[in-house]
Curated annotation (Swiss-Prot):
Gene that this sequence comes from: PLA2-I
InterPro entries: PLipase_A2_dom_sf (IPR036444), PLipase_A2_His_AS (IPR033113)
Source lineage: Eukaryota, Viridiplantae, Streptophyta, Embryophyta, Tracheophyta
Protein name: Probable phospholipase A2 homolog 1
Superkingdom assignment: Eukaryota
GO terms under biological process: arachidonate secretion; lipid catabolic process; phospholipid metabolic process; pollen development; pollen germination; pollen tube growth
Signal peptide span: 1-21
Keyword entries, A-Z: Calcium, Disulfide bond, Hydrolase, Lipid degradation, Lipid metabolism, Metal-binding, Secreted, Signal
Amino acid sequence: MPPRSPLLALVFLAAGVLSSATSPPPPPCSRSCAALNCDSVGIRYGKYCGVGWSGCDGEEPCDDLDACCRDHDHCVDKKGLMSVKCHEKFKNCMRKVKKAGKIGFSRKCPYEMAMATMTSGMDMAIMLSQLGTQKLEL
């Protein structure tokens, strides 16, 4: 029997699109540090982290993890949301932040929790990006 993970990924993607269609639109950009939904796909961390969220041009990141998110935002703006290289660079940036042993700006949303959530999100994005570039045989 063929693996069902591509079908499952499409179901999750469709669910995400539908849920985002019913939620209010995000503000145009963020000027304040946020720490919301840290253990879910709807995470908001710092000014730049989270699907659909970004800091305003020229805004300093809240911490090193938020800087990784800013750099990822810039990368996907240039190369597109399907850029696996952007997602891999983001994961590498998070690994460096973790290795440095610093503490983030939020006690409510510690690095360990936020990074685990973001890593899962990037793994899903990489899988969907790769799925979108493969030729399917019928």
